[in-house]
């Protein structure tokens, strides 16, 4: 899997000598460019960029929530409380990342930016695995919100705790992967284990509505998939957790795609809440909002350090955490198939990666573009990733420009689904209550025209 690190072997820094060939010798000195102090501060967050990005992505969501739809006060109040906690989590994450960077450097968890090799920036130790800060703040926010919002006898409490258990489990496994650097085949097993609490707690329906053009051929209007639907959700959790990890390789891409998808999920949820009169249907989408707002806020804080040029790397800890969180909200919010549409860029990247991931072609450790230090441009290689495919199709680009292009593509794919949802939601306003019993139906099937 493509990852932006080339960590050096752990160096023993104790006062004891290293024994080699029965002779005691001192550890060789590091080259001058590697003698970086662990106390050296990282670059400050890119606050201006994050502020502009936040306005672009979050303003439509709050406009729909507060002005466009007439949403009940009892439903808006917990969403705004959650938003306030998320805002506090943003500033807390911004403050904690520089502190955590010093500790991970002391433990030799760092990497070199391969896409800057041959330049002074390519010799700087970049702290790795800073996704652990995002995950820790996220867990604190969601637990505090649980105390403020859910009663002890709430029907949603079991699923909420199961969601937090799966997310926490996946964060732990991701950090283990960062430390041990496990083979990619093992990576497929990690989310399958972490998803078990989620699947065991799922109490939603497993039926889908058959599109009318297919009803004469199938003979059914509603099909109950039963246990097969849970298998689908299990594979969805595995895919979402790994797809962000393999759609990577340039500064800001991992955190950036999470921010774009999370924003699309929020807009989708508020449109479904506003277009429905069914309280249970509204609560399912509000449940999703409660988890996505903290994810978006903490990811924006991480992106302020991870945007080009990155002063920290997110690590597998973050990609696993973010992927599992979005899988959880899609499954328990009952729009798991719609979620897959938001991941269309990741689906394309996975399809391009299949020959290498499954051993049909040679798969190098880092499937990154080729960097030219003279021009500062990236050239696409023959590796099967969307990053390289985009460069081969549209020519060489700088790393910053390439990331912006890829996130724009991600946003366009997600917004197309959002606008489709908006038009259908307006058409079907007031009919959601009769559609709700098929809670697990795909978004593109439930909105089939009558």
Give the residues covered by each predicted segment.
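Alpha-helical transmembrane segments
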Residues: 2-103, 134-172, 213, 228-243, ...
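Juxtamembrane interfacial secondary-structure elements that flank transmembrane helices
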Residues: 98-112, 203-210
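Juxtamembrane helix-capping/reentrant segments at transmembrane boundaries
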Residues: 114-129
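Flexible hinge motifs at transmembrane-helix junctions and intramembrane kinks/re-entrant loops
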Residues: 180-183
């Amino acid at each position: 899997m493509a990852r932006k690190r080339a960590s050096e072997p752990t160096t023993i820094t104790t006062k004891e000598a290293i024994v080699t060939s029965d002779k005691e010798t001192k550890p060789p000195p590091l080259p001058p460019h590697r003698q970086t102090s662990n106390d050296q501060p990282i670059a400050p967050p890119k606050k201006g960029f994050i502020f502009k990005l936040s306005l672009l992505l979050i303003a439509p969501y709050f406009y729909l929530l507060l002005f466009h739809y007439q949403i009940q006060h009892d439903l808006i109040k917990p969403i705004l409380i959650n938003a306030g906690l998320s805002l506090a989590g943003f500033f807390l994450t911004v403050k904690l990342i520089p502190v955590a960077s010093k500790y991970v450097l002391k433990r030799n968890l760092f990497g070199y930016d391969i896409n800057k090799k041959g330049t002074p920036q390519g010799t700087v130790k970049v702290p790795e695995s800073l996704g652990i800060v995002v995950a820790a703040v996220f867990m604190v926010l969601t637990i505090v919100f649980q105390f403020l919002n859910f009663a002890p006898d709430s029907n949603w409490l079991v699923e909420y705790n199961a969601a937090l258990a799966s997310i926490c489990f996946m964060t732990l496994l991701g950090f283990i992967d960062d430390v041990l650097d496990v083979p990619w085949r093992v990576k497929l097993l990690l989310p399958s284990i972490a998803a078990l609490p989620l699947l065991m707690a799922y109490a939603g329906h497993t039926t889908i509505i058959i599109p009318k053009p297919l009803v004469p051929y199938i003979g059914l209007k509603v099909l109950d998939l039963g246990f097969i639907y849970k298998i689908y959700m299990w594979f969805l959790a595995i895919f979402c957790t790994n797809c962000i990890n393999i759609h990577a390789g340039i500064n800001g891409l991992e955190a950036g795609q999470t921010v774009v998808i999370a924003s699309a999920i929020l807009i989708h949820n508020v449109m479904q809440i506003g277009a429905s009169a069914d309280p249970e249907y509204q609560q399912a989408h509000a449940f999703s909002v409660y988890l996505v707002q903290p994810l978006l806020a903490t990811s924006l804080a991480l992106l302020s350090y991870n945007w080009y040029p990155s002063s920290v790397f997110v690590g597998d800890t973050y990609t696993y955490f973010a992927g599992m969180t979005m899988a959880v909200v899609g499954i328990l919010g009952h729009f798991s198939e719609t979620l897959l549409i938001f991941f269309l860029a990741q689906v394309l990247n996975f399809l391009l990666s299949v020959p290498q991931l499954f051993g049909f072609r040679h798969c190098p450790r880092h499937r990154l573009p080729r960097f030219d230090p003279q021009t500062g441009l990236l050239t696409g290689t023959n590796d099967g990733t969307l990053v390289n495919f985009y460069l081969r199709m549209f020519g060489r680009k700088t790393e910053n420009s390439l990331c912006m292009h890829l996130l724009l593509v991600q946003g366009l794919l997600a917004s197309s689904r959002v606008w489709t949802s908006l038009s259908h939601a307006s058409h079907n306003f007031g009919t959601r209550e009769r559609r709700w019993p098929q809670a697990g139906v795909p978004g593109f099937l439930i909105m089939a025209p009558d």
